[in-house]
Curated annotation (Swiss-Prot):
EC number annotated for this UniProt entry: 2.3.1.191
GO molecular function: N-acyltransferase activity
Protein task: Catalyzes the N-acylation of UDP-3-O-acylglucosamine using 3-hydroxyacyl-ACP as the acyl donor. Is involved in the biosynthesis of lipid A, a phosphorylated glycolipid that anchors the lipopolysaccharide to the outer membrane of the cell.
EC top class named in words: transferase
InterPro entries in alphabetical order: Hexapep, Hexapep_transf_CS, LpxD, Trimer_LpxA-like_sf, UDP_GlcNAc_AcTrfase_non-rep
Any one Pfam family match given in the protein's UniProt record, by short name: LpxD
Involved pathway(s): Bacterial outer membrane biogenesis; LPS lipid A biosynthesis
Gene Ontology BP terms: lipid A biosynthetic process
Cysteine pairs bridged by disulfides in the record: none
Annotated protein name in UniProt: UDP-3-O-acylglucosamine N-acyltransferase
Family indicated by similarity: Belongs to the transferase hexapeptide repeat family. LpxD subfamily.
Reaction equation(s) it catalyzes: a UDP-3-O-[(3R)-3-hydroxyacyl]-alpha-D-glucosamine + a (3R)-hydroxyacyl-[ACP] = a UDP-2-N,3-O-bis[(3R)-3-hydroxyacyl]-alpha-D-glucosamine + holo-[ACP] + H(+)
Active site: residue positions: 242 (proton acceptor)
């Protein structure tokens, strides 16, 4: 069974791999990462937000990751770096390496394609014909890999992932349990009172270093491929419709839905439960707040929000009733302005 390993490193070991300046005892042993308020012996913590700097004086961690401007506010061992939060993430990876607990191909797996000796395939996996797996791919229990799929080196599929025929997943990706890659897009042509299914003949193409959350679904393209760019991170329960293009290093939080044929530029961020209509273009560098509904293209990068502010139910109803009358109120204001102008002219 897959798990995270446990490692003990000194501050000197960590700095040798990640950089940063060690102040204090460089041989301090570190076995865990922990929050600033609760870290203790053997733990390393970090200060990324200045509003928590008052906690440094009471911190009992063996070491702290700090920016240069606050490096002298903690008397114990510390690592000084420009981005403590990113540094913490890398330290956590060093101390908790992924261990698949698997080796070779389990006897219950059905594998219809040749695979490298370094690949690990768990029980009850099905791998179809003409599948290409890179070195050190890990496929956990119950996964289904359709014919003609390509999966790059170092990629991990957790239990019960389904990858439909012809799809491509890059190197060093993580696909969490229950994700479905390459199911049919929602394509139907109206004919009278019925609907004719449109065969979805494109693929899903996922770049390198992509993470796909649990129970996320990515539809295959209708004619062109659905593309998830390098470095993208999709949370749990995200849906990507057919023909979408998600630009490199974009991040989509849980329950986001992107309708078909929408194109995101690079480095976009969508908060949880963002709803993006189809056939739109979203400019590179755009941030969309959680719960926002986007119904037209965003051509200029920035932060966009369409969520009605939280209020008591009574106040919300009152404000909602005003919103329903906005068009009439605007007409009345326009009439009043017109009358005032007429009076000014007469006066």
């Amino acid at each position: 069974m897959a798990s995270l390993g446990k490692v003990v490193l000194t501050l000197a070991d960590i700095a040798a791999q990640l950089g940063g300046d060690v102040l204090g005892d460089s041989q301090t042993p570190i076995s865990r990462v922990a929050p600033l308020a609760t870290a203790g012996e053997g733990d390393i913590t970090f200060l990324a937000n200045p509003k928590f700097r008052s906690q440094l004086s009471a911190c009992k961690a063996s070491a702290v990751i700090l920016r240069p401007d606050v490096a002298e506010e903690f008397p114990g061992p510390r690592i000084v770096t420009g981005n403590p939060y990113a540094y913490y993430a890398r330290v956590a990876t060093l101390l908790n390496p992924y261990q698949s607990g698997l080796s070779g191909v389990h006897a219950s797996a059905v594998v219809e394609s040749p695979v490298p000796d370094s690949v690990a395939i768990a029980p009850n996996v099905y791998i179809g014909k003409d599948v290409t797996l890179g070195e050190n791919v890990v496929i956990n229990a119950g996964c289904v890999i359709g014919d003609g799929v390509s999966i790059g080196a170092g990629t991990v599929l957790y239990a019960n992932v389904t990858v439909y025929y012809g799809c491509s997943i890059g190197q060093q990706c993580i696909i969490h349990s229950g994700a479905v890659i390459g199911s049919d897009g929602f394509g139907f042509a109206p004919e009278g009172q019925s609907w004719i299914k449109i065969p979805q003949i494109g693929r899903v193409v996922i770049g390198n270093d992509v993470e796909i959350g649990a129970n996320t679904t990515i539809d295959r393209g209708a004619l062109e491929d659905t593309v998830i760019g390098d470095g993208c991170k999709l949370d749990n329960l995200v849906h990507i419709g057919h023909n979408c293009k998600i630009g490199n290093n974009s991040v989509l939080a849980g329950c986001t839905g992107v309708a078909g044929s929408t194109v995101f530029g690079e480095h976009c961020v969508v908060g949880g439960a963002g709803m993006i209509s189809g056939h739109l273009n979203i400019a590179a560098g755009t941030t969309i707040s959680g719960g926002t509904t986007v119904m037209k293209s965003i051509l200029n990068p920035g932060v966009y929000t369409s969520v009605f502010p939280l209020d008591t139910h009574e106040e919300w109803l009152r404000n909602a009733s005003h919103i329903r009358r906005l068009s009439k109120l605007a007409e009345r204001v326009s009439e009043l302005e017109k009358k005032l102008k007429e009076k000014d002219i007469e006066g």
